[in-house]
Amino acid sequence: IFAPANYAELRYWLTYLVRKAHGPRMIRYARGGENPALAALPCTGARYDVLDPVDGARVALVSYGAETEEIIAAKDLLAQHGVQADCVKLTQLYPLPVGVCDTLKHYDTILFAEDTVRTGGIGEQLGFAMQQCGWQGEFLLHTVDNSHLLHANVPELRKDQQLDAAALCTDI
């Protein structure tokens, strides 16, 4: 399962999955237009990327697809409060990309944000994988509370579900 964050990644991964990959494969991509913050991200062809890493960052903000916009904004908000964080954007979701746990085990805190339900989600899988590799840090998981969902636009839903940048920062 792959979740490109912008049109460039969508084109790249769609071509790769159709022409080179074998077996079942899926792309998860949000409907609607391409957000400017996400459009600015390069398509590296990597299965995950650390976006503009900061020396000494002890916090990793992790997400995928359209929610990447919120972790980028959260990184900027945290920096305004003197907290250095790195953003890790997953493109391959399942199975988790090789090497992602090795990259993340150097952080004290990992906040994973995803716009799906908690149970059985990618964040839950990553939390388990981090535990299995011996990581002893704090894992924070922000997901959708499916006991109530508003009829609202995406920014309103993100705010209600505490998946917007401001809400992500409150746990750090």
Q: What do the predicted segments below correspond to?
A:
Residues 1-20, 171:
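Conserved thiamine diphosphate
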Residues 19-172:
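Thiamine diphosphate
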